[in-house]
């Protein structure tokens, strides 16, 4: 058994003993007619922040606050305590002359983690700390399970995620991260709403998993007796809305991909997709860099952020680099002079590039993508748009003007990681059907992430979709950068976890 396991087991043993004591205290309260769970509402007049921010107006006046008891230093006939609410902590002062001997005795029985309401007058201590001089109090929830005293000392990589409620209680920086998350998404909506975009909702359950190259989650609809998929992207439904005349739309929501879990990937994640009629991928670059700059200024007050010790500058314009130029710069391979698939495969073999399918089935475009992923991605530290992807790897995208071997697609990279993906959207129904047919062949070759045929989407394109620019951003990854967070699990309140055995 590891040292960390011993620490955890010792804490659990101590917790079990403390829980017995707390259960006994609860029984005594209930027998005395003071059951905290009979409290239905607290008439709170102020939060901790409001008391501190308005001290000059509140000095000497009576307020009622409520929160979780997080420290208690009461000995003899007086003492101090701290309670925490959503906005932070505030100090309490209790004295026997103000509440009486019995009430002080009751207060001393309270445990760390209990939730109380307090009425008292506002004052400042000799050290200048805004505090509340208690005249009355009430226990409104008894905490039966003790909080760990040294949460980070447990060194259990999973425990903070499994018991996020405790993590939020103990760690102010964790609360701050999720408050920033809300502000980031709010600012994103604000930016798009100001530009005339319409927020919409599209299905999460669908008979076809489309819009991205990914493995879906499969479920079964009993009433219809059909298999359905949790969406892997919102793209194809949003494009249907462009066909329907909604010229600027976006959706912020959950996508689901039945793939691996690591510091950058969670099976359930939040993304935004937006589409604008009569626009192209150049317009999507402008929206991307200006929206992220807007969010940075709004939430952080600057477009220069620190991430893992490095400064990232989100100030527009971002660097623009074609994939061919990136591979030439970082891998030393000039695809402008490579003639065909055979020559490209020889380079892939020389560079030891691995693919999901056999090398003999790889195209020149497959090799270009492979070289980019192997040699270029981790070099792209500052915000960079990598443009013009091979046509065989971008089935929903218009061909590049002037070079039909490529498409008008870009991905945005920051700190060596992809954060967004955008196209000049393909709106030719005939070509789109051909692309889907080619994707079906890829599935037959073993690529289970290749696109499925979506006949209804083809039908919508036959009705007619105007030239359109589309953009998708992984919100969780963006939040990681803007909060200097290493793992995606630290920006998702309840990340996907493997269930624990029943006895743990």
Curated annotation (Swiss-Prot):
GO biological process, one term: lysyl-tRNA aminoacylation
Cofactor note: Binds 3 Mg(2+) ions per subunit.
InterPro entries named in the record: Aa-tRNA-synt_II, aa-tRNA-synth_II, aa-tRNA-synth_II/BPL/LPL, Lys-tRNA-ligase_II, Lys-tRNA-ligase_II_bac/euk, Lys-tRNA-ligase_II_N, Lys-tRNA-synth_II_C, NA-bd_OB-fold
EC code(s) of this entry: 6.1.1.6
Catalysed conversion reaction: tRNA(Lys) + L-lysine + ATP = L-lysyl-tRNA(Lys) + AMP + diphosphate
Subcellular location: Cytoplasm
First-listed, main subcellular location of the protein, grouped into a coarse class: cytoplasm
Pfam families cross-referenced by the UniProt entry: tRNA-synt_2 (PF00152), tRNA_anti-codon (PF01336)
Subunit organization: Homodimer.
Protein name: Lysine--tRNA ligase
